[in-house]
Amino acid sequence: MKLLIDADYIVYKACAGAEDEIDWGDDVITVVSKFSEAMKNVERDLTRIKTEFMWDTPDMILFFSDSKNFRKKISPDYKGHRNRKKPCGYKRVIRDLRINYEVIVMKTLEADDAMGIYATAHPGNTIVSPDKDMRQIPGKLYNLTDTTTITAEEGAKWHMIQTLAGDQTDGYSGVPGIGVKRAETLFNKEGYSWSTIVKAFEDKGLTENDALLNARLARILTLDDYDTKRQEPILWTPKAAVATDDGTGLQDESN
């Protein structure tokens, strides 16, 4: 068993915690960082995670986002408010982590997507991330508090819920006035289907294209969503993501 680590989060937090400011007066303030402290912060957090799985002595794989993001081609506004530069030492920490850890960065993908692809290509590993988006990926998820097992059906449902609820942090709005709780209530009443999603968007004066855009932005990639030969994402379509209804309300509209 391997631990698939969302290292973006860990390294960003570690480097930000090692920053300090020097106010030179007048109009000059500089930001400085102690590299050894940033590395110590990272190693501390990785050790804490590994300690949670000591009985299995797992290997760790650290996943980082690429500097380019395919979602920005779909929607230029995606994460548009996240323009702050990375904290001091961020790139150097990643470079040094490669010495002792396996590090994975996939072209144009976020760390979430790379973890989703790896986890579905190699079942039996555990994703480590506090990001609720990872509830889309079937398998084990450790959110830094608890470990849960997510089924493929639960993952598909969570993607639908996020499509309606949106994510203001990531810059896609979903359906105005609908959050996670209201989305769950709506799906439980109307069924987990693409038609339910489209109707919710249309009821607010939006279109099916708006629904599809939100679904594609919300989707965390799995192996089925990735062209390994061309090394590029396969954009999500409703037909590809629905499942056979087994009494839980997830409906197949592909026929």
Where are these regions (language model features)?
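Domain-level signal for Mg2+-assisted phosphodiester chemistry and nucleotide/NA-binding surfaces
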Residues: M1-R92
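Extended two-metal-dependent nuclease catalytic cores across DNA- and RNA-processing enzymes
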Residues: V28-T30, D56-T57, G80-E253
